[in-house]
A protein has these predicted regions:
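His/Asp/Glu-enriched, well-ordered alpha-helical/loop segment
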Residues: 161-167, 211-296
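Hydrophobic residues within beta-strands of alpha/beta enzymes
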Residues: 23-24, 110, 221-222
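Long hydrophobic segments that form regular secondary structure
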Residues: 178-191, 196-202
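Glycine-enriched alpha-helix->loop->beta-strand junction motifs that scaffold or abut catalytic
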Residues: 40-43, 101-109, 164-168, 185-194, ...
């Protein structure tokens, strides 16, 4: 537990050092609650629920519900919001998705990691990928082979079929392997997207169709993922790298510094349904102000991007 707390503190300090004052974290422990409270950061902490065996879903939900209630009592404040999240789609029985939505009951924010990698896509749609090679070993004692696979549909349609989008405040993380039909479904359900492009690039997961999301008028924010998946939680590096990745893919030169900055500020606020409180410097909003020092030699000349 102390290692989790120390890790959360370090991650929070690194985020603050690059100007991040609000974080969204998916976790199975309360370490992030303690750490962000200690650091005075604004946060949405999602309690993750995971169970591959249908027989363990109710137990997993009861455990998560107990943690949510405990965290709300201990940490709930204007700075800290508690939510709930389904585990990775390749490690969850689909009943988890509908149970999470039922429990949230349009009052708790929901997060999910979806369509992150080609391996996940193939596992869900075709039942064949590196995940399927090890699934018997990974889930021995629960189920030998997930009986619902292959589904023949994309991860987004899979989630849709199980009611995973039937809530008012959903944050979908990654959304890399998404087709036009998937995008329309995400937009129709007003699902917010958190793109984590450095993580996707470092792990060879692919490139999200960011420009398509923006053109569709969807709520999109920038995420850094965690230091376990990227070298840092520096939002300035995330903005610059993300823009260059999209340009290199030929997905639109309209992405400029202003667009990326907007996604890192107001975009993130909208994705978390906090645009009335944070994301811009306006009368009536919280004064989460970041000062950027441009006096260093590495900032001369200042480039754009």
């Amino acid at each position: 537990v102390s290692d989790w707390y120390d890790s959360a503190i370090l991650g929070g300090l690194e985020a603050l050092s690059s100007g991040i004052t609000c974080v969204a974290e998916i976790t199975a422990t309360g370490a992030a609650c303690t750490a962000t409270q200690k650091l005075g950061m604004r946060s949405v902490i999602y309690r993750e629920v995971g169970a591959m065996d249908k027989r363990r879903v109710d137990f997993a939900m009861r455990s998560a519900a107990a943690d949510v209630e405990k965290w709300q009592e201990e940490y709930g404040s204007d700075l800290l919001t508690i939510g709930i999240a389904s585990g990775p789609f390749f490690a969850c029985h689909p009943l988890v998705f509908s149970k999470v939505v039922e429990y949230a009951d349009d009052t708790l924010p929901i997060a999910m990691q979806i369509a992150a990698s080609r391996e996940e896509y193939n596992f869900i749609k075709r039942g064949s990928s590196p995940f399927s090679v090890h699934k018997e070993e990974l889930h021995r004692g629960y189920v030998e082979v997930p009986p619902w696979l292959p589904t023949g549909v994309t991860p987004v349609n899979y989630a849709l079929n199980w009611g995973a989008f039937d809530s008012k405040n959903i944050l979908a993380v990654h959304c890399v392997h998404v087709n036009d039909e998937d995008l329309e479904q995400l937009k129709a359900h007003d699902v917010a997207i958190a793109v984590c492009q450095r993580c996707n690039a470092q792990l060879g997961m692919g490139v999200p169709p960011l420009t398509d999301y923006l053109r569709a008028g969807m709520r999109v924010g920038l995420g850094t993922d965690s230091p376990a998946a990227t070298d840092s939680t520096d939002m300035f590096i995330e903005m610059r790298t993300g823009m260059l990745i999209q340009r290199a893919m030929g997905r639109g030169m309209f992405l400029d510094s202003s667009t990326m900055l907007e996604m890192a500020t107001m975009g993130g606020a909208r994705a978390l349904r906090m645009e009335d409180k944070i994301g811009s410097l306006e009368v009536g909003k919280h004064a989460d102000i970041v000062a950027v020092d441009l006096s260093g030699s590495h900032q001369t000349p200042t480039t754009d991007p």
